[in-house]
Regions:
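Edge beta-strand at a domain terminus
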Residues: 2, 29-30, 103-120
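Tryptophan-anchored aromatic micro-motifs
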Residues: 2-27, 98-104
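N-terminal first-folded block
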Residues: 13-50
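Short hydrophobic/aromatic-rich beta-strand segments that constitute the beta-sheet cores
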Residues: 18, 42-44, 66-70, 96-101
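Hydrophobic/aromatic beta-strand elements that line small-molecule binding cavities or substrate pockets
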Residues: 30-36, 55-59, 82-89, 115-118
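Short, solvent-exposed aromatic-acidic interface loops
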Residues: 48-53, 72-76, 102-108
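Mid-chain, well-packed structural core segment of small domains
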Residues: 60-96
């Protein structure tokens, strides 16, 4: 486990998979996230399991943490959105793990999830 603040993380072309999620979340281990980054702007596309298609738009902070909004269409045809902050950890094998705290817009539901980088 390494401190991610000692080096700048570039999330461009990284893929992430869910390893844990709160009960009120809709993503799971079958959901795959494809990240892109330009300067401090982050965006991603995700899908799989209960998610037909989702997008993320946000910022990479100086400490490598992420702040973003997400929205997706789920398998029930509902559009859902929310906000998330993610704190990175560099794992011993060099992959990135993100600890996420999120909330749904317009609802009093909050949760936490963890995603890990998937190597090609």
């Amino acid at each position: 486990m390494q401190n991610s603040e000692s080096l700048k993380i570039n999330y461009h072309k990284k893929r992430f998979q869910v390893v844990s999620n709160s009960e009120t979340g809709e993503v799971d281990s079958n959901t795959l996230f494809h990240y892109s980054q330009q300067d401090d702007v982050l965006w991603a596309v995700y899908q799989g399991s209960k998610i037909k298609l989702g997008t993320i738009t946000g910022l990479v902070k100086e400490d490598n943490s992420l702040e973003f909004s997400y929205q997706h269409v789920n398998e029930e045809g509902k559009i859902r959105s929310g906000k998330c902050t993610s704190t990175p950890e560099l794992m011993e094998d060099g992959r990135i793990k993100l600890y996420e705290k999120w909330s749904w817009d317009g609802e009093n539901e909050i949760g936490e999830s963890t995603v890990e980088e998937v190597l090609s």
